[in-house]
């Protein structure tokens, strides 16, 4: 199958870019973009490679994505080696095919076609690419956004190529994401012998009523755009492993995925009030990995919906479900942010794959979005 989108996707898959190692993917993309007149600025931080590229001036539409992938797992369980792209029955297999090297290829090919047809386009077309989205994400998009904001770069619209679709390309478009807040809580007691509980203070026993009340809280009911806030205990640990020792500490880690009905400060205040109510001795550490954001109907959402309807003859659902993405950082620039990408059924799995025809379709959708916003 000879198709520029498929060929570029295959070239990217062959580069084993385990986060945050770019493995040469960005050099390939940069070469293609420079060939059509893009100015490219490398913005590397620590072990992470990033670049910001632009062509033209004025109202700005950026395409954002990541070259890094998650580990493939047991390579013997793949139907073909994970970094040797293979097409079987119309499906392109390989680590990163769906998340998100296929999207990157579709973006670049769409830009090539767009520039060929609109060499003097009126707006600015840009790319923001990182090699660290799947791992810590500390030196990727967030650092680039900080640098761009420090020099007052303009960013009006951003299309993130994350695999948003469920069954067919464009059936789901993400126009926002929930916030994510993690609490690392240690409850302090006094270690001792289980036969002498009066000489100890069991933090597990003390924390049990608190945890029972915590998990029963209805944080909010969500709203038109977001499901209700969810709190889940992710890790809990206490004890020495011995059956005759009362533990001295209990560690509990829990995560909130929260809607725009709440702020992180509101959540923190409620948790701390509950800790005080139960008279617990504790230390607490919070990690806010992203605020919730929402892009309401406007020029970007309308352009994306139009492109999907034009090429796939379906009306996409606008959802905010799922995990976080780098869109949470880009939204800080005041940009309208929308995610549109391939079907996500196999992302992070053994035998990750994407329908090859879907990538061709995605490139056409991306090009139409460019034409509506910056032609």
Swiss-Prot record:
It is an enzyme of class 3 (hydrolase). Pfam families: M20_dimer, Peptidase_M20. Its cofactor is Zn(2+); Co(2+). The active site is at residues 68, 133. Keywords: Amino-acid biosynthesis, Cobalt, Diaminopimelate biosynthesis, Hydrolase, Lysine biosynthesis, Metal-binding, Zinc. It catalyses: N-succinyl-(2S,6S)-2,6-diaminopimelate + H2O = (2S,6S)-2,6-diaminopimelate + succinate. Zn(2+) 1 binds at residues 66, 99, 162. The keyword ATP-binding does not apply. Its EC number is 3.5.1.18. GO terms for molecular function: acetylornithine deacetylase activity; cobalt ion binding; succinyl-diaminopimelate desuccinylase activity; zinc ion binding. Belongs to the peptidase M20A family. DapE subfamily. PANTHER family: ACETYLORNITHINE DEACETYLASE (PTHR43808), N-ACETYL-L-CITRULLINE DEACETYLASE (PTHR43808:SF31). This is Succinyl-diaminopimelate desuccinylase.
